[in-house]
Amino acid sequence: MIAAGDEPVRIAADEQSGAPVCVEIMTGAPFPTSVSGDELDCCVRNEDVTVIVDETSNRRYIQVFKPAKARQNRRFAGSDFKKSDILVDAGEVVHPGHILSVASVGITEIAVMRKPRVAVVSTGSELLPPGLDQSPLHRISDANGPYLTATLESCGAAVDFLGIVHDHAEPLKQALSSILRKGYDVIITSGAVSAGRFDLIPAVIRRLNARVVFHKVAMRPGHPVLFAQILDSSSSDGQPGRETAFFGLPGNPVASAACLRFSVLPYLKYLQLQRPDDPSHAYLLPPDDVETSTTKEHPVVSTFRGDMDVFRPALVRGSSGHVQVKLIQDHSPGKIKPFLHSNCWIHIHRGVSELKAGDIVDIYPSH
């Protein structure tokens, strides 16, 4: 008998009887080699044979009840993975299936990129830190900081939520200066990027040597979003300092979530050599309060200005082999409850002025 883990063995022919040689072998054991010139090239399951003992010679034989063929139940080296096969491609996120593959060929370590380090800061004098009394009517709980932190962590970033900074220029500048010295790859703030008197982020980051790449884009929600590179001017060797990516997101929670999904996360994918997400496609369902009829099979679901890209929370469903999606009707950049009941975003492209039931739309996962 040959068991799994045994060294390969050589089997000699039975010269006395002249009968073909067979060997009992366990799953995972190496096939034996024959010194008689006849290759042992087939394995028959134990369930498909009967062992017969010759009472005269005490020799054991097997009787096979099912047809056998060459290479049956035999696994050859290289029949699964071959030399030069790619197990994990550059830019892929390592998942358990990759671990199964690399471990099976004896690889115990693989080179990976480090997680991007991200600092998250909420701005707003009206915000309450977590755990404080919510009874004052002029204060609200900070929703953006925890949401941004949780989403970024789920997407593979190493995130530090650094708290709330009030709407005052000097404390805000000091806080960002301190964060810049800690070597983060990306800094994200929420709030204070629009056009109000206390929207201080654009002016403050310019005082910190920021190179603003864009501020205010043609998208809804999230129009005020800002992206900049902040140069570290503290280098003492005359060489250019490192640049830190900075995203200023709007304060309205759903607008902040949209900018995170369609501005920040694509940038993090770029840092990690990953491909941007491609949209899936789904058929748009009519609203619950609209009844289709023979006279109006494809009612208008929603209308748009058409001068910018619009991202709307939606609920995707599968039905009869087709992916269908329902637009969340009760939407507002500042209302969180409708967002809670969504699981995807619909991208309404610039130039589209209306969507009708039955239209095929682009959808993206919520994060």
Identify the meaning behind each predicted range.
Residues 73-189, 194:
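Phosphate-binding glycine-rich loops and their immediate beta-loop-alpha structural context
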Residues 1-108:
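Phosphate-interaction motifs
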